[in-house]
A protein has these predicted regions:
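Intrinsically disordered, low-complexity proline/glycine-rich segments
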Residues: 2-94
């Protein structure tokens, strides 16, 4: 099962996720990441692929979920800065 992605978790490009929209749901003391969260390089909106867990009406992001390009694209891998880490002990089945 995939790990739940959170605020501050890494992206493939070396950025971290900015997941501050839902400050009332935490995983390991970090705000949970939801569909559309951006990264620390600017842009890079995450596309949640979890099909059945919502926070504030948005799907939860999991480790490995894809992202749109960030502001440093076309430098690789900024054109697809996918989620690349998550909680060590909180998982969601697909």
């Amino acid at each position: 099962m995939p790990q739940v992605h959170r605020n501050g978790d890494s992206r493939l490009c070396g950025a971290t996720t900015n997941a501050l929209a839902h400050m009332n749901v935490y995983v390991n003391s970090q705000p949970i990441s939801v569909d559309g969260d951006t990264n620390s390089h600017g842009g890079g909106s995450l596309g949640a692929r979890c099909k059945n867990v919502f926070v504030g009406g948005k799907l939860v992001v999991l480790n490995g979920n894809p992202a749109g390009r960030d502001t440093l694209c076309p430098i690789p891998p900024h054109c697809g800065p996918d989620a690349s880490s998550g909680s060590p002990d909180v998982f969601i089945g697909l």
